[in-house]
């Protein structure tokens, strides 16, 4: 099973978590057709209770609300810690023009989130991932061919420097790590290159402790037609299924206007993950047999931010994908043009 998730939004780097029986995706946002990753300035959250109907909760954090950052709001993650929801994200620091890992807080899993500032003790804090088990929290991050992990201090404002581990030599990771647990093993999934050649493939390594050491296990998302060059994602169990979320260029054909993907994965008895077979590319517009709804009734208007945008499979007469962008002030409504092409 492989599906495109919410094809009306261009987004990437999905981090999946289940809170109170609902699946949430925390994603970076691709500004459509800008032909650069430098234009990424905000994050969205999406959620579902059935893997079919998705709610886009809208913008959960924007660059304009992060005083220390200037650009490059790339990959993120989120998790629940001591009754609050925390977002770990990365951006270029205004003082150094290098990546730092930021921390933001919310009372709700769908946000919006409020920036708390950078996490101390993290060098080149690109692509942070946030793992919680019991009374311990971990930060995993990576970029420029390195992946590192450390235990958070209790307030999440810094990491315990004595716990920092560089995992790069053992697993040959490139960036974008994510940690999940299956049975008694910890699975670190991450993008990797084959002899420094692009595109990236999704690899994984396992350990008996979150801090490692990790053993490389192989590739479970190989190169496929319609990839976006990069691949970044997560793995989660939901309603009895193990699911991999990642991004591709299946809808736009562009590496900078990416689409969210969902594939079911299977584990063998020895714990290995069966490689996915993604051999079908969808050219141009895709038929999703659903109506895309911008549901203003559940979307409080706040300074141009639209929250609670709903994607629903309530109809079978819509066969395209679109997006609404560029809202800068509070409005009562949005007009959307729909064009229907007849057979022949």
Predicted segments, located by residue:
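Carbohydrate-active catalytic/glycan-binding domains of CAZyme proteins
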Residues: 1-302, 308, 312, 317, ...
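Extracellular carbohydrate recognition and processing domains
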Residues: 225-227, 316-344
